[in-house]
Amino acid sequence: MCSLPGSRKPLLRVAVTGGTHGNEMCGVYLARYWLQNPGELQRPSFSAMPVLANPAATAACRRYIDRDLNRTFTLTFLGSTATPDDPYEVKRAQELNQLLGPKGTCQAFDFILDLHNTTANTGACLISEVSQNPFNLHLCHYLQLQNPGLPCRLFQFEPPGTESYSMDSVSKNGISLELGPQPQGVLRAELFSQMRAMVASILDFIELFNQGMEFPAFEMEVYKNLGSVDFPRTTDGHLTGTVHSRLQDHDFEPLRPGEPIFKLFSGEDVLYEGDSVVYPLFVNEAAYYEKRVAFLKSEKIRISVPALPGLTPSSTQTP
């Protein structure tokens, strides 16, 4: 029986991946450290496997070599016949799928935690591709309780179409941790320490789940993706303005109709023309310029999360 997201079996095969983007340095250096010092990832019921996801991009200190690895874990790419001309990240995605998957099968890892940094002022943010996943909701709530001085928000992002494509989608369940702001190619000590502590708390939560702890019901706020907004551009694609100073660094804060979002190079303000309040995130993220994204929009909703029952003694036994 597979330990799928809604199942009642312990999570024994866990991976922590860093360097999916080779210039997001907290995950890069944590993965490198743990590969040499894996004891920090050990818990009584499991030992998480550290993985440096994109070693070529990491060596070059670039987001990727040929294409974004974190957009490459679709069944089309994973199931394609390998050729010498394949982009590096397609080859690497297939290797990672063999190591941690195969995606969509009972042989896949139980859980992948994928580590990222952003240049945007998001603070700590968990990204879940599975809407209303009770395990991930309880995980986020646990982090909020364990780290009251570091707000941790949950962003629900369901990719367009029907298939997920991220690194953590290879496992039966998974989540991405974003921490910012940190410039590309730079390692900031306070963010390195914060990410390290959050990974420890996530592994502690999995251990408590495996040991049969019951987690009570609660209410929480989540941010649900509403799409993206591009920069103002000329017809040939060049920017004609940039993110307004009133919006810059205000991730997860309310953006109301009529408030400025861009400052044109000619001096005029561009105002938000939506008909309701939204909550922007990944504002002016450096890596998203090529994706024609100035920021993402989200709606903040409050949800009631049911209790996560404890596992039965028989199901908590390790093999």
Swiss-Prot record:
Main location: membrane
Annotated stretches, region: Shielding domain: 211-318
Keyword Ligase attributed: no
S-S pairs: none
A Pfam family reported for this protein in Swiss-Prot or TrEMBL: AstE_AspA_cat
CDD domains hit by this protein: M14_ASPA
UniProt subcellular location: Apical cell membrane; Cytoplasm
EC id: 3.5.1.114
Transmembrane segments: none
Binding, substrate: 63, 70-71, 178, 288
KW Cell membrane (keyword) present: yes
Keywords (A to Z) from UniProt: Cell membrane, Cytoplasm, Hydrolase, Membrane, Metal-binding, Phosphoprotein, Zinc
Cofactor detail note: Binds 1 zinc ion per subunit.
Residue list for modification Phosphothreonine: 318
Hydrolytic domain: annotated segments: 1-210
Top EC category: hydrolase
Swiss-Prot/TrEMBL catalytic activity: an N-acyl-aromatic L-alpha-amino acid + H2O = an aromatic L-alpha-amino acid + a carboxylate; an N-acetyl-L-cysteine-S-conjugate + H2O = an S-substituted L-cysteine + acetate
Subunit structure comment from the entry: Exists as a mixture of homodimers and homotetramer, both catalytically active.
PANTHER family: ASPARTOACYLASE, N-ACYL-AROMATIC-L-AMINO ACID AMIDOHYDROLASE (CARBOXYLATE-FORMING)
Chain's role: Plays an important role in deacetylating mercapturic acids in kidney proximal tubules. Also acts on N-acetyl-aromatic amino acids.
Family the UniProt entry places it in: Belongs to the AspA/AstE family. Aspartoacylase subfamily.
Protein's recorded name: N-acyl-aromatic-L-amino acid amidohydrolase (carboxylate-forming)
The organism's taxonomic lineage, starting at the top: Eukaryota, Metazoa, Chordata, Craniata, Vertebrata
